[in-house]
């Protein structure tokens, strides 16, 4: 039975038993920014199990795409070498949300395995949690399992929990016996780690809630979460022991063998490549881009591991991306999203392959040299050099070292990494340069409601040290109890403005966070005196704040528009919002086209014209997730978050924003560029700056049109016409120069010398460029058949030299040696092939003597 048939039979079986078939969720969890990847079928139902979400169904079944690589579930080093380790797998699962419980869950599983798949009962072994008498009774007395194939397990292997607190409960696991020819004992025995008995289905019964004291309380509506690996059950149905022997993998292994020109289909490297193309393709299809952090770095590690195994098989050219088409033919019917994204997936993989190819060869040479030293451990310095200089992820180097029986100094690598981070920290710009150790009350921010706020000076810092007062001309950092000044956060720069006291005026140039809830106002006391305890009127620069708010609000609209135009793989990678512009970095693997930029501009300006009201609300993080607010992976959010609705955008944001989208005025993208592999950057302006930019562009167009004597709308066509004329004239000029050089060559016939039967010519041609010199050399070589030629030209005080030697003489005379000999006399150097070489120089006055010396050089070398 094919894997696709097993998947289909599973879904059909549970659909006939009242389950709603729910499509696989993306590999990037949408409801949990703290989770790296979707690693189980229950992830998309987590909020339902926690009681934070309610679905229109109480029974569900799915075939869920999963990735386990990085973090807790890191099987990467074993993938390809064992029978059942994978980075990507499919989990078949059925779920009950307060509907059926143990009895039906067990009966469904048993019926599917024995009646639908026809697996012999005597091949199945059952385990339950030691204290779960209810499940034991159902298995033994209702299903009728032979007690000799039944085990109670007292360890946590048979007790599942979501975390230290929350829903939890006992498990019942179903194992398949692959037969006595495979080593290993039954579950629960000392030999259980063998491969004979393989877990194929886990039934989790969520019946308790564990409180902070560790006490278990019965849940009012117990639920069921089950998971069965498609690859494992397919191996059972196809009567093979290794997952890599099933039909799905065999097709990919054969494709990998074709792409790497490999004939040995049992190679572990082919297993690695076949596994990794699944993980990489689906991750990219779901919006992950190779990068240097988070999900992007896990993806990059997997890609580079696959490339390295191709290299090991002898494939030095990009090959991995070719397998996307093969994967689509295998899994595209079950997952149409892969078919839709396959062109983009292939392009991303090819780009990453080409990027790594630039350093792989050199990195392997460094690694091979280190491994040949014979040390039992590869040192941390080499590990870090391979990582930092050649892009070798640590686990890739560890893989290669392990194949040679050599350990790695991971602690030394970590130390080298920390030293680099420390260097980066000390050399990076940090606006609040003084090390301020503040202890005291926090700052209350009032800047959402008002730009003027009365407050009191809590502390003053001068050159990093706390002082009681400052005087006119002093630079300092002021801490207030209440402030309207926004402190730099979330990409938005800090506010500027003034602190007005009875005895002085303090100009605030920037506002930074000293601590999470303590704001430092950095600036200069322009006049008077300011002391701790003084009352001040804090007033933000209204014009600068307004421009910053426009730019911040438009960033949200632009982010949404970019996702709409380019795809949902677009994810924010960084931003900078100030009074002049917004700069936005995002995941995307190719330049944004002019047409795409225009679409983004149209969408954003349409939102501005709609003049929709902006609404900010505080809500619980779980409510924010359910509302669909965009969150950033890796960000740490508090239990209560600020959700901003602006136009059709909804994001978590603590920044300051316009009241209505119309306040933005106008939006214009002014630059687009790449900042790293898979990361693009756009810069945009708003309001009067957008208008000024457009007017400047219009003025430039008018000037260009005037210069080419055309109307602005005809300028492009006129310039194209002029450029075509220039190209025509350049070709004519080239022909004239060739003709001139040819005629000069004829004039120099009397300058040809004969030395030991070899014709030698060394002359300077007037008005000749390098192309003309080469043509003239070829002409002389064709004319004299056996000759040595050195031709020179002088332009703008620079000497150009070309030397030619006919093929019958190159065993004795090298053009590269000759041209270098001449070039050294005119202040230059050069080189090239034995038959043709070129050089340059900076001393044209020495050229006549240098050319005169050619004859003697040839005579010496013949």
Swiss-Prot record:
Gene3D superfamilies: 2.40.30.130, 3.10.310.40, 3.30.54.20, 6.10.250.550, Bira Bifunctional Protein, Domain 2 (3.30.930.10), Threonyl-trna Synthetase, Chain A, domain 2 (3.30.980.10). PROSITE patterns: AA_TRNA_LIGASE_II_ALA. Pfam families: DHHA1, tRNA-synt_2c, tRNA_SAD. Belongs to the class-II aminoacyl-tRNA synthetase family. Binds 1 zinc ion per subunit. InterPro entries: aa-tRNA-synth_II/BPL/LPL, Ala-tRNA-lgiase_IIc, Ala-tRNA-ligase_IIc_anticod-bd, Ala-tRNA-synth_IIc_core, Ala-tRNA-synth_IIc_N, Ala-tRNA_ligase, Ala_tRNA_ligase_euk/bac, DHHA1_dom. NCBIfam families: alaS. HAMAP family: Ala_tRNA_synth_B. The keyword Glycoprotein does not apply. It comes from Nitrosospira multiformis (strain ATCC 25196 / NCIMB 11849 / C 71). This is Alanine--tRNA ligase. Keywords: Aminoacyl-tRNA synthetase, ATP-binding, Cytoplasm, Ligase, Metal-binding, Nucleotide-binding, Protein biosynthesis, RNA-binding, tRNA-binding, Zinc. Its main location: cytoplasm.
């Amino acid at each position: 039975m094919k894997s696709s048939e097993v998947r289909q039979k599973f879904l059909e079986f549970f659909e006939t038993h009242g389950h709603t078939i729910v499509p696989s969720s993306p590999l990037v969890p949408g409801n949990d920014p703290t989770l790296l990847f979707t690693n189980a079928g229950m992830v998309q139902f987590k909020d339902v199990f926690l009681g934070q979400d309610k679905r229109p169904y109480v029974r569900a079944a799915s075939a869920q795409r999963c990735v386990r690589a990085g973090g807790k579930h890191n099987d990467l080093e074993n993938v390809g070498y064992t029978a059942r380790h994978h980075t990507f797998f499919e989990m078949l699962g059925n779920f009950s949300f307060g509907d059926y419980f143990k009895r039906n869950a067990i009966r469904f599983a048993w019926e599917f395995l024995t009646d639908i798949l026809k697996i012999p009962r005597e091949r199945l072994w059952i385990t339950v949690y030691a204290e779960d008498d209810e499940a034991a009774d159902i298995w033994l007395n209702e299903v009728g399992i032979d007690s000799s194939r039944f085990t109670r397990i007292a360890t946590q292997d048979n007790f599942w929990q979501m975390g230290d607190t929350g829903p939890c409960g006992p498990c019942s696991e179903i194992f398949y016996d692959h037969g006595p020819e495979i080593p290993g004992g039954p579950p629960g025995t000392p030999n259980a780690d063998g491969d004979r008995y393989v877990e194929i289905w886990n039934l989790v019964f969520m019946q308790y809630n564990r409180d902070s004291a560790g006490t278990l309380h019965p849940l009012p509506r117990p639920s069921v979460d089950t998971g069965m690996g498609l690859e494992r059950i397919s191996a059972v149905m196809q009567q093979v022991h290794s997952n890599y022997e099933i039909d799905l993998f065999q097709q990919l292994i054969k494709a990998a063998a074709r792409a790497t020109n490999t004939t040995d289909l049992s190679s572990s490297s082919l297993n690695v490549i076949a596994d990794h193309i699944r993980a990489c393709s689906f991750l990219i299809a779901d919006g992950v881009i190779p990068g240097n952090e988070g999900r992007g770095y896990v993806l990059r590690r997997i890609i580079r591991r696959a490339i390295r195994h191709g290299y090991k098989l002898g494939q030095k050219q990009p090959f991995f991306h070719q397998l996307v088409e093969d994967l689509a033919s295998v899994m595209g019917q079950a997952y149409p999203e892969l078919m839709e994204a396959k062109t983009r997936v292939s392009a991303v993989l090819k780009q990453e392959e080409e990027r790594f190819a630039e350093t792989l060869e050199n990195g392997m040479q460094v690694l091979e040299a280190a491994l040949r030293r014979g040390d039992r451990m590869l040192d941390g310095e080499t590990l870090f050099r391979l990582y930092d200089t050649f892009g070798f992820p640590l686990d890739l180097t560890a893989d290669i070292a392990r194949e040679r029986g050599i350990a790695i100094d991971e602690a030394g690598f970590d130390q080298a990494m920390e030293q680099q981070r420390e260097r980066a920290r000390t050399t990076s710009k940090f606006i609040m340069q003084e090390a301020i150790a503040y202890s005291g009350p926090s700052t209350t921010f009032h800047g959402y409601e008002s730009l003027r706020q009365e407050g009191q000076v809590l502390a003053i810092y001068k050159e990093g040290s706390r002082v009681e007062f400052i005087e006119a001309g002093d630079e300092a950092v002021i801490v207030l109890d209440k402030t309207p000044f926004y402190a730099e956060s979330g990409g938005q720069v800090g506010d500027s403005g003034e602190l007005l006291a009875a005895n002085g005026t303090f100009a605030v140039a920037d506002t930074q966070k000293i601590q999470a809830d303590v704001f430092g106002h950095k600036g200069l006391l322009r006049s008077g005196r300011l002391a701790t305890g003084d009352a001040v009127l804090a007033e933000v620069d209204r014009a600068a704040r307004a421009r910053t708010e426009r730019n911040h609000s438009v960033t949200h609209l632009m982010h949404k528009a970019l996702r709409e135009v380019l795809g949902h793989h677009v994810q924010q990678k960084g931003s900078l919002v100030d009074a002049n512009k917004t700069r936005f970095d995002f995941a995307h693997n190719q330049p944004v086209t002019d047409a795409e930029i225009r679409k983004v501009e149209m969408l954003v300006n349409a939102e501005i014209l709609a003049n929709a009201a902006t609404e900010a609300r505080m809500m619980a993080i779980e409510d924010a997730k359910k509302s669909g607010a965009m969150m950033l992976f890796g960000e740490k959010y508090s239990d209560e978050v600020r959700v901003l609705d602006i136009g059709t955008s909804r994001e978590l944001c603590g920044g300051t924003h316009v009241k209505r989208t119309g306040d933005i005025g106008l939006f214009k993208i002014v630059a687009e560029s790449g900042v790293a592999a898979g990361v693009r950057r756009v810069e945009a302006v708003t309001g009067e700056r957008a208008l000024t930019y457009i007017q400047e562009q219009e003025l430039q167009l008018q000037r260009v049109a005037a210069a080419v004597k055309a109307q602005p709308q005809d300028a492009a066509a006129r310039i194209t016409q002029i450029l075509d004329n220039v190209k025509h004239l350049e070709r004519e000029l080239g022909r004239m120069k060739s003709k001139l050089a040819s005629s000069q060559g004829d004039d120099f016939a009397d300058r040809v010398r004969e030395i030991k039967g070899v014709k030698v010519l060394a002359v300077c041609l007037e008005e000749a460029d390098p192309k003309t010199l080469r043509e003239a050399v070829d002409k002389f070589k064709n004319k004299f058949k056996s000759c040595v030629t050195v031709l020179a030209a002088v332009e703008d005080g620079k000497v150009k030299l070309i030397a030619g030697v006919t093929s019958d003489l190159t065993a004795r005379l090298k053009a590269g040696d000759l041209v270098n000999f001449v070039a050294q006399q005119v202040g230059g150097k050069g080189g090239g092939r034995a038959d043709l070489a070129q050089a340059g120089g900076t001393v044209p006055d020495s050229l006549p003597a240098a050319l005169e010396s050619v004859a003697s050089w040839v005579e010496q070398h013949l």
